[in-house]
From Swiss-Prot:
Single biological process term from Gene Ontology: killing of cells of another organism
Protein name: Sphingomyelinase C
Superkingdom of the organism of origin: Bacteria
Keywords from the UniProt entry: Cytolysis, Disulfide bond, Hemolysis, Hydrolase, Secreted, Signal
Reaction it catalyzes: a sphingomyelin + H2O = phosphocholine + an N-acylsphing-4-enine + H(+)
Record InterPro entries: Endo/exonu/phosph_ase_sf, Endo/exonuclease/phosphatase, Sph/SMPD2-like, Sphingomyelinase/PLipase_C
Pfam family name, one: Exo_endo_phos
Lineage, opening ranks: Bacteria, Bacillati, Bacillota, Bacilli, Bacillales
Activity control summary: Activated by cobalt and manganese ions.
Amino acid sequence: MKGKLLKGVLSLGVGLGALYSGTSAQAEASTNQNDTLKVMTHNVYMLSTNLYPNWGQTERADLFGAADYIKNQDVVILNEVFDNSASDRLLGNLKKEYPNQTAVLGRSSGSEWDKTLGNYSSSTPEDGGVAIVSKWPIAEKIQYVFAKGCGPDNLSNKGFVYTKIKKNDRFVHVIGTHLQAEDSMCGKTSPASVRTNQLKEIQDFIKNKNIPNNEYVLIGGDMNVNKINAENNNDSEYASMFKTLNASVPSYTGHTATWDATTNSIAKYNFPDSLAEYLDYIIASKDHANPSYIENKVLQPKSPQWTVTSWFKNIRIMITLIIIQVEATISMK
């Protein structure tokens, strides 16, 4: 997967009695904060410094932790928190704002999890790089490692993190994931087919969890499924993703991509000729409390610029952080 950071806005109209179908701004103005859940998904591109020592993982952990955009959410899904030291630093920086946190997916299978499911292995070289942080108590934490990946993804415990979060007297279920990357090293195995099977594993988990149908289930993170040029194609992988999860298709605003080499210097350095892609989402299960309005809004805050040295060359870094801040306006009454 190509590194990026994503923020979106999602507004969920309320369940049985009071569905709201206006704009997201109107929805936000019309509801009390106690009746609102705001969720963000954020790919921080913290690859291991053992392999990539010069991408400012520690510096970015401090920038992310201090940034205004990451504040005042209810829940934040973090992707690619692979580097142990940098991810520990980031989670520590977020602790004051988000005191309730999961461990990083696949890093261990200890008591920090209520359950470890799927294909977890302590001998896999890399963890799954997903964590969830919350302002509100997390009543249950489950990590699930996918059955299969291809290419370099086979060397990581990729999967998803499930959290049961209690805001006031209402439970909301948030799943954060990072699906199979598009990779030529997969050989004859189709990365898209691997992603489809991973989505089926998520859906099977949700069904087997027997979550009450009057509670919201949100699935978010780096899906590695490109929306661009696929929205009007019912046979596309993009359309298939929503069918497999039986999830609502959100509306989209803000920047038109969640990974864009024209706005992110690390992406440009690694993939200078690659086209922009829209790969990150937060969506809601239609098998449970179904929002009347969902919007994914992509914003682009910029980091300060700094210079690193790699192979005796100075590289100037200025990252435009592409973020999906998803605000879920739901009834908590």
